[in-house]
Amino acid sequence: MKKGLSRRNLFKYMGVGGATAVVAGCENNPEKLIPMLVPPTDYEYTPQTAYQYMTTCRECDAACGMMVTTREHRAQKAEGNPNHPLNQGSLCARGQASMQSLYNPNRHAYPLADGKQIPWEEGMQQFTAIIKAASGAIAYLGKPASGSEGSFVDEWLQAAGGGQRVNFDLLTQNSQNAANKISFGRADIPEYAFEEAGLILNFSADFLENWGNSVENARRFADMHAYQSGRKNKFIHISPHVSLTGAKSDRWIVINPGTEGLVALAIAAVIRNKNDSHKFLKNYLAAYSPEKVSEATGVPVEVMYELAADAIKHGPLLALGGGNVSATDQSVETLVAVNILNAVSGALDKTVRFYDQTAPESSNHQDLTQLISDLESGKIKLLIIDESNPVYALPPSMAFKQALKNTFVVSIAAQQSETTNAANLVLPALTAYESWGDAFPRSGVNSIQQPVMATVNNFDAKAREDILLTAAQSINKKAFSGNNNYLDYLQKKWQKIQRRVGDSGSFDSFWISVLENGGIFETSKYKSVSLNRKVTAVKVNDPGLADDNGLTLLPTTSLLIGDGSGANKPWLQEVPHPMSQIVWDSWVEINPETAQKLGINDRAIIEVTTPHGSVQATAYYHFGIHRNAIAIPMGQGHQNSGEVADGFGINVMELLSDKMDSAGNFALVGNRAELKLINEKSYTVNTDGNARQLGREIAGATTVEKLSKGEAHHGGHKRPIEFYPDRSETAGYYKPYRWGMTIDLDRCNGCSACMVACYAENNIPVVGKVRTGIGREMSWIRLERYIEGYGDDFETRFS
């Protein structure tokens, strides 16, 4: 027998040792490949069987219907509810990514008192004690609630001894409500029937992104703009900035910032003179003729006459206005002007339709200013902040964070944020996936929100309404009598809905049908409106933002992370912005002509300074912006919102003033900026490679005329569509289906929801900014953006 170590055993031991070294280098906590090795006994389930729950998306106030697929009682994928009348089975990118709110590791896992973990019992004791001590000097700050939550909070404040409720939404539509009140006597938002329009004149409203219900708008716009019967309806974008919405337009009319209202009135003046309608407007509109407003708007006289002729020839017209880019201190006046244009063109009750029920008016940003004043003076002893993030979202000049030092702050929230970091007491709340609620986003649309799974392990959270209800009942035994939890309260509200819709059956069967369907959806009823004569008292002025006294700053909103509430979702950070193709960052859009005059290269680091603050970000050349303006998207620049959000980009709100319009909403546009070159190069990651097709015919296009005559080329030459040899001769290989995908790129608006859905469906990992920069793009679907042409006549194509 040989002594010593054989060659075979040597390699064997080396292999074992190498494997041991690899294992030792991994994380200490082993991954559980089989999560249910010991199945739970407290509920029944069938392994690998999918169940769908109908609920409501709460990523924004659009409140789309949602269908959540679960397996083993875990939520796995969100899709749109096909039964819902608004989104009809679709979801936007934020809706697709909403699952990351549920499983986010940066959720609050337990109550915190001054940043230290405490048990729930102690947290509730502190909460009830401060409610008693406040003696009605309470303020409740939360997002606008269209469902039962609003009345619940009002009743809770009464039970707690009194107080005030203030709604906060940075992207509110209150200016539009105010304009509609002046124009039609209705302080609510109408239905915009895109599909009924022959021409859309859009005055800076980003209706495919963050204006109204973008999912519904996208569907209806696609129907309106589709090629049908040899023709295609027109969409003209009238704005100082081309957003994703503007990129889908047939024509861009560049205007001076803040002059949307003047252009709308000039077009209305021409149309009114042609059809001789609304005689009471004759003298009023004469002051806004194309000849009189051309210099102020920067739009040639003949162009405004062309737009009026288009509206007459290709009607019905749909004129839209509002959004960030037009949010000057004259927002209300601008929107009244758009309403006048719709009225004189005959759009009312055709493409602009009001419901028979009016929506309740909500608070505005002036109410928030008063709240800050009350905090500073010590009038408010207890401030409850429900999920919103005003510390991040408000301009620093309002000194909201400093005012919090004068009161006791309780934050009831699921996610970490700058606001929860500033609170004295944090009570972790459940997400919308784990709790009950409802929403009534439109007349006749009653949507239910139900828990689709139990609370995620490791997060000791409670429903925010149950937290409030428990506290109220511990103080006032008569509070919410007969309600053991918020579900009881909610069901009583829905009993009233059952009676209203005429359902005479048992409530149990009615409730089950509501949960199965996602709500109760009644047929919309409309009420005719007419233009109020008092619109002639509204004066639309030139804001004077196109001179050489600095560049006008246009804060825009990303369709991905919105106002910043989506910044801690890695899918939304890693999916490239459809226009800039930039990931994990902020940028400053600047016209190439302006940049070259200032000696600023594309992708250079520049310093942006306004009278209110200064930030550094990357310059991004964009033909689609006025030469005397720059644009910076909102939503980045977080400091205490979780590891995904923190440290990326800048917060544009740090550059803005606290000036407001006549409706009490922030005048986001009106701040002048100076630029300074800091560095010739920046580390900004974008995925487009080259914005030009370089003759490769990747994103082909044709004209309606050629298509109608049959002269349009099919777009390329036949190429193999698969790597493998054809197996059509193999019996049964393509039965029952042969998989394929066809995408109508003419209807695609670049919303990127498909890319986020790809991450969700296939459990694709994110790699972060650095690895994306070296080509580690993990999504199985790419959305390529190509630029054609130069200057104001450029064109954007998606492929």
How does the language model describe each region?
Residues 2, 67, 138, 192-199, ...:
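Domain-level signature for respiratory redox metalloenzymes
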Residues 1-275, 283, 291, 300-302, ...:
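N-terminal export/assembly segments and adjacent metallocofactor-ligating motifs
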